[in-house]
Structures are given as structure tokens and as C-alpha cells.
Amino acid sequence: MQGDFDRAVELYQGSIALHPTAEAHTFLGWTYNMQGKVPEAIAECNRAIEIDPDFGNPYNDIGAYLIELERYDEAIPWLEQAIAAKRYDPRHFPYFNLGRVYLAKDLLNRARELFRKSLDIEPRYTLARQALENLRRMVN
């Protein structure tokens, strides 16, 4: 599996050398994250934002990476920027990730609202549905 990620890094770097796009930097960031290289992943997302500040994915991804590092307060503005981004289709992701932040901060009502909002946008999003069910079990 590691070889696949190493090869993906090479291919994304080659693509970026020929034609740097926000998407390619974001995908390279995902690959770095899968390798456990979170600082490199965040750096690639920042490069993506420099190229296209309207592209929402890298904002959400930085927020998600910060959540994994348990840097919850730092994640919030990144996720809010993802929600506000002009060019971002899977808007349910930042709402779900904000819900994760507020759940970790023990702000359960706010977390519930955000998980519901994620499901309003994408009713088939299993992770948000599971998070909402887990939250209901915690409260009851």
C-alpha cells in the first residue's frame, strides 16, 4: 500500500510541475495525509488556496487534519471558510467536521445541529447519520 502512495505522490508532483492546479495540490495533500505526513498535507492545501481561494476542498481538509491533531479551535475557521467557499460541491463535509469539533468540545446541541445540517445537504451521508445516532445514545 505504501508503494501506491509513493507512486501517487510522484504522479501528483509531475502533474503539478506541468500544470499546477488547486485540485492537484489538494489531492497531493490527501496522499500525504494518508502517509501520516500531516504538515506536508496542510502545506499542499495552503498552496491550493493560493492558486484558487474560492476552492472549498482544501479549507475543509485543513480543518479535518487539525481535528485529527485535536487542535479543535484552530479547525473551526477553516471549516467555516469551506462552508462559505464559492466553489465547493460536497458542502456536507465541513458541516459534519464542525459537528465533530463541537462534539469533542462537549457542545452537544451544536454538534447535533451540524450533523443534521450535513444530513439535510446529503441524506445518504452515513458518517453523519452514525454520528447523530451515537450522539442520541450519549444523551439518552
PLM region descriptions:
Residues A24-H25, P58, H92-P94, A128:
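TPR alpha-solenoid repeat register
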Residues A17-L18, I51, A85-R87, I121:
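Structural marker of alpha-solenoid helical repeat scaffolds
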Residues Q2-L11, Q35-R47, L69-A84, K105-K117, ...:
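Structural signature of tandem alpha-helical TPR/SEL1-like repeats
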Residues M1-E23, F27-W30, M34:
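Alpha-helical segment of the N-proximal tetratricopeptide repeat
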